[in-house]
Amino acid sequence: YLVNPAGYAALGAYMFLLILIGFPVNFLTLYVTLEHKKLRTPLNYILLNLAVADLFMVLGGFTTTMYTSMHGYFVLGRLGCNLEGFFATLGGEIALWSLVVLAIERWIVGLKPIRNFRFTEDHAIMGLAFSWVMALSCAVPPLAGWLRYIPEGIQGSCGVDYYTRAEGFNNESFVIYMFTVHFLIPLSVIFFCYGRLLCAVKEAAAAQQESETTQRAEKEVSRMVVIMVIGFLVCWLPYASVAWWIFCNQGSDFGPIFMTLPSFFAKRPAIYNPMIYICMNKQFRHCMI
């Protein structure tokens, strides 16, 4: 054991709680939306993609972590580590790129840079395809030999190898690629879109260019997406910051808990994403009831 056995028990209980809550609420989000035709809007396709990403994390990652925590180390070998690391990375990246698509959609709706443009089902499908391609371009390379997945922290789960410069894996180039293409760029796009959108909302409110009902509806949707983005940052920034510090300070002395805490803190989006959607979408709540 790298830590007191009680720590593994606490981790297993935490993962069980995430599974107990995360699976039903994400499955409910998918079921209710697919069951009610009026909920099958282009915007909701992207929100459904978030639910699918969360289910990948719950079924492919959380269950594995709970099982290994019961043994006190990662007992599933190289194949199990690759699968767990792949599903966790894929789910997180699908969620991030879905938020990018939502931010662009909100920017187009709010600022109307393209006159007479409507966000249609075809655009939503292209957005879904884009989020999956980008997520796979981050999650697949470690399986193909560009970097690798290894047990991290207290060895309860697997993640990207920020810790070593193992020969033959080109860890440095992949970590730089991952942080640039799959973290800094999407966050920059999100901040740009919402920064511009905030200015546009203020200008529209001052000029009263749209009806009060339309403004209220657009503000509610934008508020929901912004809260999802903030929640994503709160959960993932600590993990990204610690991972980057470890990568830049390899050889430094740090304990297993140092990486474990932000790693498992980052798993909470699987719960709060559907919660935000359910709590802030009146139409969905009415269909659910």
Curated annotation (Swiss-Prot):
Residue numbers on the Cytoplasmic membrane side: 33-44, 105-123, 196-223, 280-289
Extracellular side: 1-7, 68-81, 145-173, 246-257
Residue numbers bearing the N6-(retinylidene)lysine modification: 267
One CC-aspect GO term: photoreceptor disc membrane
Gene Ontology MF terms in the entry: 11-cis retinal binding; G protein-coupled photoreceptor activity
Span of the annotated motif 'Ionic lock' involved in activated form stabilization: 105-107
GO biological process, one term: visual perception
Protein name according to UniProt: Rhodopsin
Lineage, top ranks: Eukaryota, Metazoa, Chordata, Craniata, Vertebrata
